[in-house]
Amino acid sequence: MRTTYMAKPGQVDRKWYVVDAKGISLGRLASTVASILRGKNKPTFTPHVDTGDYVIVINAAEVKLTGKKATGKIYYRHSNHPGGLKQRTAGDFLAKDPEKMVEQTIKGMLPHTSLGRKMGMKLHVYAGESHNQAAQKPEVLDITNLI
């Protein structure tokens, strides 16, 4: 009798990938990176185990916003104080804090559970070309073929 393969947390082989976000649409980038963080690209994917890889996103400041999203899409946050609702457009958000915008978009596509938070910790986003994870010897991943 055959049984479905279920990965164990200690048996997962993780890789490090570098993704260049230059000129790629934000949503397409986020969905592809979220899939890699979950491990959906592996044959050993198990829904209840974190089987994903580490991802480093570089050039987050040069991600592309299509259509009128730069002026029409509004991000809201609240300080939990009366009258503390803050808002800013996607264009302002991208100009002031591109790392946080890309990270927030990718984490929004992960499961909203404790396992999803663990998956989100494997994401590293940088606005420019350089990153601090050279010691991990990350592979360059061209996601234009995966989109």
Swiss-Prot record:
Gene3D superfamilies: Ribosomal protein L13. Keywords: Ribonucleoprotein, Ribosomal protein. InterPro entries: Ribosomal_uL13 (IPR005822), Ribosomal_uL13_bac-type (IPR005823), Ribosomal_uL13_CS (IPR023563), Ribosomal_uL13_sf (IPR036899). Disulfide bonds: none annotated. GO terms for cellular component: cytosolic large ribosomal subunit. One of its GO terms (biological process) is translation. GO terms for molecular function: mRNA binding; structural constituent of ribosome. PROSITE patterns: RIBOSOMAL_L13. NCBIfam families: rplM_bact. This protein is one of the early assembly proteins of the 50S ribosomal subunit, although it is not seen to bind rRNA by itself. It is important during the early stages of 50S assembly. Part of the 50S ribosomal subunit. HAMAP family: Ribosomal_uL13. Belongs to the universal ribosomal protein uL13 family. This is Large ribosomal subunit protein uL13. It comes from Limosilactobacillus fermentum (strain NBRC 3956 / LMG 18251) (Lactobacillus fermentum).
